[in-house]
Amino acid sequence: MTVLNRMDTLAEDMVADITDSPTGYTGVDGDAQWAAEVRRLAKLRGATILAHNYQLPEIQDVADHVGDSLALSRIAAEAPEDTIVFCGVHFMAETAKILSPDKTVLIPDQRAGCSLADSITPEDLRAWKDEHPGAVVVSYFNTTAAVKALTDICCTSSNAVDVVASIDPDREVLFCPDQFLGAHVRRMTGRENLHVWAGECHVHAGINGDELGERARANPDAELFVHPECGCATSALYLAGEGAFPAERVKILSTGGMLDAANTTSARKVLVATEVGMLYQLRRAAPQVDFQAVNDRASCRYMKMITPAALLRCLVEGADEVHVDPGIAAAGRRSVQRMIEIGQPGGGE
């Protein structure tokens, strides 16, 4: 990947201030001068900038497109630009490469991993499949390219129930890697031959039922937007089931579903159980609504590794480029295509 001539850019002084550490690149403020330079460098490189909903506000503001991982991967495939800068975690950039094999895909910091995607390896999945010969493997979109390549059908949080329901009821199903989304699918389908991998997103798992219940009872007129990866999703449904909270105000939603619901809600206050970066998009979508985090400490350190310094470095140096083995990419692409053939995949995570 070409390194831009720094002597021809206003970024020269800013790049000189960048420092690297295990927690990411720092030394640059996401101010107006930085934003203008990022946009100029992206144009010089012929790149489009994509940012996930959980990114820092300044990264979301400078991006050409903001959304969930599936929506952004589709945008990457359709974009006229030959270079994609994916501001998100590594599996998301991999997925963009799977769906856009002929494009250059960059991630501002390749160390931005994902605890959920890392909770199952290809070796784990092969061993699990050996224990259940003939089972259909359904993998959440939040998986590595290598796991997608061993998957029969991918799913998103908004279509996981429909994907599993489409499978022959006599076939065993291996659902990975998120145990909370898997529990939600089992609850909605009533399927007893659904085996669920014990993986989790460390951020969503940390939003517990006790704090959700406490916040809900303290705000009886609020709506609840709960991501299905949350450890508190079952508690949210229990609150509705026992009558402690009106069922119509408890909504289990993907990030895309949350944005749709934000645009139509009549509630004055909404309690949100997901990564706190989502609040920025929700508040922009419906500024008249008071969106509050159920847990304001629910911040993904990997998402926040995509800093202003990292994005500037990425555009100057053309780093870090994402590569996926062509065979793995082809197999992973098939599992995503099968999901799309079943029906509208909706939002990603």
Swiss-Prot record:
Reported cofactor(s): [4Fe-4S] cluster
GO biological process: 'de novo' NAD biosynthetic process from L-aspartate
SUPFAM superfamilies membership: NadA-like
GO molecular function, one term: metal ion binding
Known pathway: Cofactor biosynthesis; NAD(+) biosynthesis; quinolinate from iminoaspartate: step 1/1
Entry binding sites for [4Fe-4S] cluster: 114, 201, 300
UniProt EC number: 2.5.1.72
Pfam families: NadA
Any GO CC annotation of this UniProt entry: cytosol
Keyword Transmembrane helix: no
Chief location: cytoplasm
Record-linked InterPro entries: NadA (IPR003473), NadA_sf (IPR036094), Quinolinate_synth_type2 (IPR023066)
Homology family: Belongs to the quinolinate synthase family. Type 2 subfamily.
Primary role: Catalyzes the condensation of iminoaspartate with dihydroxyacetone phosphate to form quinolinate.
Designated name of the protein: Quinolinate synthase
Lineage: Bacteria, Bacillati, Actinomycetota, Actinomycetes, Mycobacteriales
